[in-house]
Amino acid sequence: MVNIHMIIGLASVAAFLLLTIVNGLRAFRGSELSWARGLSFAAAGLLLIQYVIGFSLLGSDHGMKPIHYILALTAIIPVGAEHMIAAQETDKQRAHRTAFICNLATVLILIAVYEIGQRNA
């Protein structure tokens, strides 16, 4: 189960990294990439799967440093902000910038979480 958690964790980091690049292109170059919203929901879905597997591992007494759990749960904030704040923004350019900033924050958090998990697996 730990290996699956690590694989999906890496996929989550990759998905949010790609999403950050896509939203950066949308925000700063004006590119219209219609599939960005689908990618956003797919990345969030991977993160949800990570939480389910992570709580399963936590329930089975798998040892991990508390900072791993704290940072992992912190990633909910920028993901939620992207889906809530950016989606309600009427100015497209501002919505894309907000999504980019939220995705960048998520990527940085997830890289830290993944690295902690990698070192303590």
Locate predicted features:
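Short alpha-helical packing/oligomerization segments
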Residues: 53-81
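Loop-to-helix transition at the N-terminal end of transmembrane alpha-helices
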Residues: 32-48, 66-69
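Juxtamembrane boundary at the C-terminal end of a transmembrane helix
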Residues: 108-121
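N-terminal signal-anchor/start-transfer transmembrane helix
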Residues: 11-29
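Hydrophobic transmembrane alpha-helical segments in integral membrane proteins
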Residues: 1-17, 118
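Membrane-interface helix-boundary motifs at transmembrane edges
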Residues: 27-38, 87-95
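Membrane-helix boundary connector in multi-pass membrane proteins
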Residues: 59-63, 81-97, 115-118
